[in-house]
Amino acid sequence: MKKQLAIGSLISLSLVAMVGCSQQATTTESAPAVVGIDPKIYTDSLFAVMKADRTNYTKLVVKRLGPAGADVIKPDEHWEDIENGTLLPAQMFRAGSEAVAEMTDDFTYSLQSLWPIGKQNGPKTPIEKAGLEYIAENPGENYYGEEKLGEVTYYTAVYPDVAVSDACTTCHNDHKDSPKTDFKLGEVMGGVVIRVPLAK
């Protein structure tokens, strides 16, 4: 737990340091003005926070409350329909994404898969499909590219979503709508797609 908090603090301090450096650079006359943060650094930093939150929710909350846990609050796909229900990790992730979309249009993110339980969570653009295929075939690597949607060019990054707990594999392998039922711990189950509009 202390290690997880230390990592979270390190990420927070790094982001503060980056912001502080950019502010300092814009106020120092001899230094060139900083236009913005590199999209790769931006998306990598966002993913680090998302991954930490998702992993901790899965391991520290859902795993402890599930069938082998306290059974006080019940993580369930249909959590709204049962007494003391709560969201599954993927649903919590989507709820966060929807809340962010209401606050800013500086970036969007979603959880997608080549083997989605819900069809709406499959790839919708060629770069999403290419990214999901790449991370599935190259474990531990990320995928980066640019795509034009409408009149806007986006920097799109796809990061592996790995089964961090048996709660992940059991849920997917046992689900009646899952197109893949042999996931193993540590395997790539899908990807986190982060999209950032690029300045014209």
Q: What name fits each language-model region?
A:
Residues M1-S9:
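Bacterial N-terminal signal peptides that target proteins for export
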